[in-house]
Amino acid sequence: MSKVLIVDDHPAIRLAVRLLFERDGFTIVGEADNGAEALQVARKKSPDLAILDIGIPKIDGLEVIARLKSLKLDTKVLVLTRQNPAQFAPRCLQAGAMGFVSKRENLSELLLAAKAVLAGYIHFPTGALRSINQQSRDNEARMLESLSDREMTVLQYLANGNTNKAIAQQLFLSEKTVSTYKSRIMLKLNAHSLAGLIDFARRHELI
């Protein structure tokens, strides 16, 4: 069965989570009451799942999530916290967590979330996901606004499948100039490939 690490600075919470998961057949491989200890246990035990409060001492939970991700462990993170989901769920997702459950929820919700996360799904409050999606759309809108008129034109040509040579002929530019525009556009839109540019253009109905 899956191996679980529990990280919370409240012993009663750790005990409740341990009992819940052990009853369901999970193996608890460690507990920690602070971020530094959590990272040590994670390195040593390589748990499948870390159930983590973000309001913990020494190293806060958001930093723990980021460090676990940088360590390239196969540990999925499920946040269990009293913090406001609207404010902290997006931050947890951006840091690398795969789930977020409020301590105000019934503990059975935590078990459902854990199973979803271990199966490869994300589990976040619906309102928080809407907030995350809106933030992403706002960021992309600002990226588009940073493009010059000429860059926007080149983007549309690229997104429609035109080669640098074809674009150069259409716009009476050199291929080198088109290539420079393409590089600038990819940098401004944080796209790492032509496919990424096309996806971006499609999301914003430019093609």
Curated annotation (Swiss-Prot):
Stretches assigned to coiled coil: none
PTM annotation (4-aspartylphosphate): residues: 9, 53
Residues in the DNA-binding region annotation:
155-174
Q: What is this protein called?
A: Putative transcriptional regulator
Q: Enumerate the Gene3D superfamilies for this protein.
A: 3.40.50.2300
Keyword Transcription recorded = yes
**Domain annotation HTH luxR-type: ranges:** 140-205
Keyword annotations: DNA-binding, Phosphoprotein, Transcription, Transcription regulation, Two-component regulatory system
- Protein role: Probable transcriptional regulator.
Q: Which GO terms describe its biological process?
A: phosphorelay signal transduction system; regulation of DNA-templated transcription
- SMART domains from the entry? HTH_LUXR (SM00421), REC (SM00448)
The Swiss-Prot or TrEMBL record annotates one GO molecular function as:
DNA binding
**Tagged with keyword Amino-acid biosynthesis:** no
Sequence ranges assigned to domain Response regulatory in this UniProt record: 3-118
What Pfam family is a match, any one?
GerE
Source species, please?
Answer: Pseudomonas aeruginosa (strain ATCC 15692 / DSM 22644 / CIP 104116 / JCM 14847 / LMG 12228 / 1C / PRS 101 / PAO1)
Report the InterPro entries cross-referenced here.
CheY-like_superfamily, Sig_transdc_resp-reg_C-effctor, Sig_transdc_resp-reg_receiver, Tscrpt_reg_LuxR_C, WalR-like
Which superkingdom heads the taxonomic lineage of this protein's source?
Bacteria
Spell out the PROSITE patterns in the cross-references.
HTH_LUXR_1, HTH_LUXR_2, RESPONSE_REGULATORY
